[in-house]
Regions:
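The feature captures the conserved acid-bearing segment of alpha/beta-hydrolase catalytic domains
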Residues: 118-188, 192-195, 200-204
């Protein structure tokens, strides 16, 4: 506790953080405030309460008593992904129970509706689902908790989650251009995140120079999301209709261009697919999957040099991209660059022990 300050930070950690460790530890400890760090090491999304404290109601009482003891006047709740959801859930409830305190929330990619298709809460939670707290849209809206939701515009679920709350007055949406889901990590490599959070504390604004216009358009998020789901259901024709409409709304969105390219490829429209993948790369040079599909299509067309370049660019963007490493290894084997082929296959085996395709390449070359 910092008894000289009436400001309190409550930081909720994201997934896969071991017991005793906390996210934002260094940044929040630089703040002139009292600090509370919370972690759910079993990826429970905080819907069963704070581990070691009890269910959500008991956890709220626990935080209520601490804030009273600290004589808090201002509270900032902060968290990425699972932690962003926790910050919004507990912030909304605490604000209604403690109206004399100013509560604010800074969420980095938190979900507003858990367990829907493509939601990380459905894929990564290691605890039973709790439908009672699955959809917090009405809760955060009625609580009037001031929320800033910062999210990457290179993530379909994050874009759709923002779509779900677009227009709610107390939620300020900020999309970050070409950022993946781990938007706080992405921003931490590009800006002074401590300074940005301190400015938010002082002025109530979280300013990002790399903000995109994706957060401004509600319909785009639904079109992209449902176009993606239709592709998963092998309904490429309907997916293309939605994705083409999404592109008319935001033509310069790399992820939408990439997804349209994939849908076109499903219908074997290779030339059109390649065009949209190249548009995606022009908009986001680090979009690994777009590089992979350009490489794959180029190899199909016999352009080995272009294929090699884009496989390597894919791996530069995502060094653990197994499909790109395997494809590049096969390409090198085809052109008799055996040492390079082995190098790629050994990298695959380092990331994916026992990978059959990599083992087969190694056996063929070293027999």
């Amino acid at each position: 506790p910092n008894h000289k300050s009436k400001m309190v930070y409550i930081a909720f950690s994201s997934v896969d953080i071991p017991r005793g460790a906390f996210m934002f530890w260094k940044i929040i400890n630089r703040m002139d405030a009292s600090k509370i760090f919370i972690n759910d090491e079993h990826n429970g999304w905080y819907v069963h309460g704070i581990p070691g404290v009890g269910d959500v109601n008991k956890s709220i009482d626990f935080l209520f008593n601490i804030l009273n003891m600290l004589k808090a006047e201002e509270v900032i709740l902060i968290g990425p992904s699972m932690g962003g959801y926790g910050a919004m859930l507990y912030g909304a409830i605490l604000k209604m129970k403690m109206p004399w305190i100013q509560f604010r929330c800074l969420s980095f990619g938190g979900e507003f509706h858990l367990y829907i298709k493509e939601a990380r809460s459905g894929k990564l939670s290691k605890k039973p689902r709790n439908p009672y707290y699955a959809d917090i849209r009405c809760l955060v809206s009625s609580s009037e908790l001031d929320i800033v939701q910062v999210y990457g515009d290179d993530d379909i679920n994050d874009i759709y989650q923002a779509h779900l709350v677009h227009g709610i007055k107390n939620i300020d949406l900020i999309s970050v251009r070409n950022s993946p889901h781990a938007v706080s990590t992405y921003l931490g490599k590009k800006i002074d995140l401590t300074k940005a959070i301190k400015n938010y504390e002082s002025y109530g604004k979280f300013e990002v120079e790399s903000a995109s216009n994706v957060s401004q358009f509600k319909e785009h998020g639904a079109l992209l999301y449902f176009g993606h789901l239709m592709m998963l259901d092998n309904n490429a024709k309907e997916a293309i209709k939605k994705l083409e409409k999404a592109i008319t709304i935001i033509p310069d969105h790399a992820l939408t261009q990439h997804k349209l390219g994939l849908a076109l490829l499903m219908l074997k429209k290779e030339k059109e697919a390649l065009l949209h993948q190249e548009l995606a790369i022009n908009l986001n040079p680090d979009l690994a999957h777009a590089h992979f599909h350009i490489a794959m299509l180029s190899e199909m067309n016999g352009d080995i040099k272009k294929a090699e370049y884009h496989y390597k660019e894919c791996i530069r963007s995502d060094e653990r991209h197994i499909r790109a490493l395997i494809s590049l290894s096969l390409l090198y084997e085809k052109v008799k660059e055996y040492e390079l082929a082995l190098d790629c296959s050994y990298k695959v085996l380092a990331y994916s022990e026992g990978n059959k395709m990599a083992l087969d390449i190694v056996r063929r070359i070293t027999k």
